[in-house]
Amino acid sequence: MRLEAKDIYAGYGKIEVLHGATLRAAEGEIICIIGPNGSGKSTLLKTVFGLLKPTKGTVSFDGKDITRLEPEQKVRLGIAFIPQGRNVFPSLTVRENLEMGGTVLDDEKAVQHAIEEALESYPLLKRKIRDKAGNLSGGEKQILSLARADMVKPSLILMDEPSIGLSPRMIDEVYLKIAEINRRGTTFAIVEQNARKALSMAHRGYVLDLGRTRLEDTGAGLLDNEEVKKLYLGG
């Protein structure tokens, strides 16, 4: 199993948000995590990445216990995290943002090679290579966040609300890129309020509620689930 989070309890100070949440993702899978606001979805991703330390439970990656590792250690293992909110450096150019994504590469030559590969894969960014990231649209910033995370070809990408605030056209573009990267074998764990979009391409999905994993099924299975339809798919 590429990623497995078991019986996770975590939160912020004395406020516990997760109460035994569990998820798993096999190599090459796209999994999505849906649920109401405040259910602990983002907290779960932050705990997997190491931004929060669980009070109970374990996180394993390719069979290795990584529960207590720091985020920078997890990056070197091949895990990338794209938080909610267009995680770019607004005062830096598109190229400079991509360079920041290559900091774990061995040398400058490797970084520049990765940038050239990224620009071939993301033509939208190639056209704006000298623009400040802060001047990009919301969708362009999300594409830049994804391209920067993809610079080191991680084996697992964690994404928090990739479609929030985007136009339907840009949502489609972001998810097309996710599908393209996934075809290389990269695993994705995606927290998403746009449940229909995420479940339609997910191999498996999870419903989180009140800090617990309430449902697990294939993406198609959750799309057909009457309770999920009523609560998260508009009927």
Residue spans of the language-model regions?
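ABC-type ATPase nucleotide-binding domains, specifically the catalytic core motifs of the NBD
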Residues: 13, 69, 94-113, 121-123, ...
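The feature captures the beta-strand-to-loop junction immediately N-terminal to the Walker
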Residues: 34-36
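Conserved ABC ATPase signature
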Residues: 132-136
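ABC ATPase C-loop
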Residues: 149-150
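Catalytic Walker B motif of ABC-type/P-loop ATPase nucleotide-binding domains
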Residues: 157-161
